[in-house]
Amino acid sequence: MTGLGVMVVMVGFLAIASLQSESRPCDTPDLGFQCGTAISHFWGQYSPYFSVPSELDASIPDDCEVTFAQVLSRHGARAPTLKRAASYVDLIDRIHHGAISYGPGYEFLRTYDYTLGADELTRTGQQQMVNSGIKFYRRYRALARKSIPFVRTAGQDRVVHSAENFTQGFHSALLADRGSTVRPTLPYDMVVIPETAGANNTLHNDLCTAFEEGPYSTIGDDAQDTYLSTFAGPITARVNANLPGANLTDADTVALMDLCPFETVASSSSDPATADAGGGNGRPLSPFCRLFSESEWRAYDYLQSVGKWYGYGPGNPLGPTQGVGFVNELLARLAGVPVRDGTSTNRTLDGDPRTFPLGRPLYADFSHDNDMMGVLGALGAYDGVPPLDKTARRDPEELGGYAASWAVPFAARIYVEKMRCSGGGGGGGGGEGRQEKDEEMVRVLVNDRVMTLKGCGADERGMCTLERFIESMAFARGNGKWDLCFA
């Protein structure tokens, strides 16, 4: 298997007790992060996972039996990337050397040192993924009692460790369930697909030259620059007034805002004395968070949403194409047939039942936020949503449930469910009638929000028939716009 450039590894057991030894009331399996929500739910892709409001009932209907469940998950909370970490160190250094005084609320910056490191999963991120595994088990208990998920992960350390933590959470829930009929042992097997340049990897696709390096590669940054110019000026002026001599730019202001979520998810302390000043319930938010108002955090959230939409999602002509390979793998799993794809799939892996088995009831894959944006685009999750305004903020309720914080926060998860219903639900025919008894139905949830998939005529419960769902994936089945990647 090593000759295929892939490893099937045994997951090392990280004692769940050590992860759960501290009280963590802010972050629970069912609801995710619920402290300081007026701020913490508006950090874009740096938000810790939280259960997103759903207009449709997200529970499994009483008249339906789930027969298949797939989760595609982002890794848990991490430290900044190496490039961003270096930029934050430079920013703090410039403040220390330039500022001649520190205004009210800014005094902590006088002695602040950047100590977050780079790239690695944080303790909060580990716990998020343990909680995610617990939640997956509980939701799909009827299947999970009988079968553990088949696990794949992109090869970066934080993603692999997230997959490990997920399996530990799943396993702890299984052991606590007296009704379970399987007794697997940790570590679980998993397929680790390397993220080396040029590798076919649907969980981290970087093969599309025009998207990675060509004219499509700057669309997201350009859109963010446009929106940033509409709101950041007054904030930067206020920050500079409190840090005279620092001479910060709008980009520096955004970097200071970035440090709020990164500092918060890096902390595992519980200090009730400072809880009310930040997140409450024993998990204070970083002092960086208090430098900005709630309305400014909403603008920050939208800035990140614009970047993801135009950088990797439906707003980029090649964004959804990056998710086509995974969607074609999903279709193969749903239908129980071999993968048919001409994009980013690895034919060697997907053609081997050891590394891509069909007929399993549970699957769990682990990836990155940008790759998940491509998958959501390829699924048509936000079809019908107008192009995001680059000059005025829009709320997610106006955008079909889209915001970076609602779609791809740390530990984000997409659930794809297949179920048989007894005839009491809708039929995937645009709401025009009821399905045949025991017809197979498919539904997609993004962080607990039921997505109304327009392409397959989702019913009043968000369900489409399996046949209509597969038919509606014509974009993916036709390889998207892959031909433009190398034009």
UniProtKB/Swiss-Prot annotation:
* Residue numbers annotated as active site: 75
At the top of the EC hierarchy, this enzyme's class is hydrolase
Q: What is the recorded name of this protein?
A: Phytase A
Residue pairs linked by disulfide bridges in the UniProt entry: 26-35, 64-421, 208-485, 260-289, 456-464
Q: Where is the signal peptide?
A: 1-19
Instruction: Report the protein's function.
Output: Catalyzes the phosphate monoester hydrolysis of phytic acid (myo-inositol hexakisphosphate), which results in the stepwise formation of myo-inositol pentakis-, tetrakis-, tris-, bis-, and monophosphates, as well as the liberation of inorganic phosphate. Myo-inositol 2-monophosphate is the end product.
Q: Which residues are sugar-modified?
A: 165, 200, 247, 346
Q: What quaternary arrangement does the UniProt entry report?
A: Monomer.
Q: Where in the cell is it found?
A: Secreted
Q: Which family does it belong to?
A: Belongs to the histidine acid phosphatase family.
How does pH shape activity?
Optimum pH is 5.5-6.0. Active from 3.5 to 8.5 with phytic acid as substrate. The optimum pH is shifted to more acidic values with 4-nitrophenyl phosphate as substrate.
Applied biotechnology:
Phytic acid is the major storage form of phosphorus in plant seeds and, thus, in seed-based animal feed. Phytases are therefore of considerable economic interest.
Which Gene Ontology CC terms are recorded? extracellular region
Query: Which reaction is recorded as catalysed by this protein?
Result: 1D-myo-inositol hexakisphosphate + H2O = 1D-myo-inositol 1,2,4,5,6-pentakisphosphate + phosphate; 1D-myo-inositol 1,2,4,5,6-pentakisphosphate + H2O = 1D-myo-inositol 1,2,5,6-tetrakisphosphate + phosphate; 1D-myo-inositol 1,2,5,6-tetrakisphosphate + H2O = 1D-myo-inositol 1,2,6-trisphosphate + phosphate; 1D-myo-inositol 1,2,6-trisphosphate + H2O = 1D-myo-inositol 1,2-bisphosphate + phosphate
PROSITE patterns assigned to the protein according to its UniProt record, in alphabetical order = HIS_ACID_PHOSPHAT_1, HIS_ACID_PHOSPHAT_2
Quote the EC number: 3.1.3.-, 3.1.3.8
User: Molecular function terms in GO for this entry?
Assistant: 3-phytase activity; acid phosphatase activity
Q: What UniProt keywords are attached to this protein's entry? A: Disulfide bond, Glycoprotein, Hydrolase, Secreted, Signal
Q: Which residues bind 1D-myo-inositol hexakisphosphate?
A: 45-46, 74-75, 78, 81, 158, 308, 368-369
